Amino acid sequence: MNVNAKRDNSRIKEIEIMDCTLRDGEQTNGVSFLPHEKLMIARMLLHDINVDRIEVASARVSEGEKDAVARICRYAKTIGKLDSVEVLGFVDNNKSVDWIAECGGHVINLLAKGSYKHCTQQLKMSPEEHLAHIKQTIDYALSKGFTVNLYLEDWSSGMRDSRDYLFMMMDELVKLPIKRFLLPDTLGILNPLQCVEYMRQMVRRYPNSHFDFHAHNDYDLAVSNSLAAVLSGAKGLHVTVNGLGERCGNCLLYTSDAADE
């Protein structure tokens, strides 16, 4: 993709592109952006490349991150794209929501657990307890005027190993005013055939929901899996500049051009 040329959004009617360079991309070993660098990259992504959405940070990481998010939100507001700026937040007694609000943002990508193992072993909660905490956080975010998207962390493992748990959670979550469900292959375990199978099951079971797919490149399949997800009903793709990201990286930004086709 030519980074100096704006993406032609007229070619994509349904597929949203969310660039995660400033959040997941910064988890690349040895990569760290200063606040002014984050603002510069955000300007490029929102204005020059014209991606639909950007995820710019994880809440409550540092004062430097808070400064960067505030700068990006101020800029995005001046060009009418504040709704395109998203921040990863946590189920943490509303601290993430307040942090994002203090930065001037109002879109939270709330991190919930998409596998029984993550729920019971990481959080040491029952699914019912986790669900209650999620609902409370969403209620609070909505009271502050937020748009809420929801990550189902470890979704791919959940579909493979604990589908009953995942569907029980989704059956309740779809009743809430969640705008998008973000489905990550957190450990990078999927191949394209599994991606097709799992995404189709989600789309068929929850036909009125918007699903994003978030790939990891551990087996060099992030691009293939992302395209498989789109062909199977995903309405959003998560990408990063040059495939930056945790461990082996994420789906490449210029893959969105292939998705256009």
Protein language model features and the residues they cover:
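Catalytic cores and adjacent flexible loops of soluble metabolic enzymes
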Residues: 1-253
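Conserved small/polar residues in nucleotide/adenosyl-binding loops
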Residues: 254-261
